[in-house]
């Protein structure tokens, strides 16, 4: 059995294959930088039991050469869960690049709760500008669009305050508490992006 996972901060898609049959599962997202070992274990526990696992290829947010400690943490948790020796944990961007181009060449992009892009060649990333996460960057991502929307609405630059609050069943106070007192502000802000699309005019 081989497992391939594609994980952002919000959701993770798992493909489990024996070479003949493939099953797809979804769990909450795993960001190796943001999540503790306990949180990673909770996400892994959402998977159904698998047969003997030969290899796990995990492509996830917060993994890869930029974050060696977080990647090692992810590998440890995957090994503890699946009990296999063959574990690879790489950035979700590399997973997207390999899925798009295989060993070819081109520009691969991720646009979800976060955002990232790269130039890839031969199944490897050869050039990448760091996305910097939702506080410092992630331009164009759901979290950045949501952050900019909330900012514009409450500063009066976007005259849709009542429509926004009604559409999401929120108050100003609730928004501030969710962003500054609860974890995963990026996951809270990203679902506001469709509101931007609905009011493009």
State the predicted function of each range.
Residues 2-42, 51, 125-127, 131-132:
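Short glycine-rich, Thr/Ser-proximal phosphate-binding strand/loop in the N-terminal lobe
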Residues 10, 61-64, 113-116:
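Short glycine-rich anion-binding loops that position phosphate/pyrophosphate groups of nucleotides
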Residues 12-17, 98, 109, 115-120:
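Short beta-strand scaffold segments in enzyme catalytic cores
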Residues 49-89, 100-102, 182:
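Short beta-strand-loop/turn "lid" adjacent to the catalytic site in phosphate-handling enzymes
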Residues 125-169:
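Glycine-rich phosphate-binding loop plus the immediately following alpha-helix
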Residues 157-201:
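A mobile "lid/hinge" subdomain adjacent to the ATP/sugar-phosphate binding pocket shared
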């Amino acid at each position: 059995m081989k497992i391939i996972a594609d994980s952002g901060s919000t959701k993770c898609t798992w493909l489990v294959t024996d070479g003949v049959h493939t099953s797809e599962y979804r769990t909450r997202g795993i960001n190796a930088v943001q999540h503790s070992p306990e949180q990673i274990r909770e996400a892994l526990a959402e998977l159904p039991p698998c047969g003997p696992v030969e290899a796990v290829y995990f492509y996830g947010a917060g993994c890869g050469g930029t974050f060696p400690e977080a990647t090692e943490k992810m590998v440890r948790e995957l090994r503890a869960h699946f009990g296999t020796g063959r574990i690879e944990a790489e950035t979700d961007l590399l997973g997207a690049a390999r899925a798009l181009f295989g060993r070819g060449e081109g520009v691969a992009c991720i646009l979800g709760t976060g955002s990232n892009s790269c130039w890839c060649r031969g199944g490897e990333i050869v050039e990448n500008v760091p996305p910097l996460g939702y506080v410092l960057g992630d331009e164009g991502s759901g979290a950045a669009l949501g952050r900019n929307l909330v900012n514009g609405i409450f500063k009066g630059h976007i005259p849709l305050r009542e429509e926004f609050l009604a559409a999401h069943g929120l108050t100003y106070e609730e928004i501030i508490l969710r962003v500054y007192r609860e974890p995963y502000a990026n996951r809270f802000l990203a679902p506001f992006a469709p509101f931007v699309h609905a009011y493009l005019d």
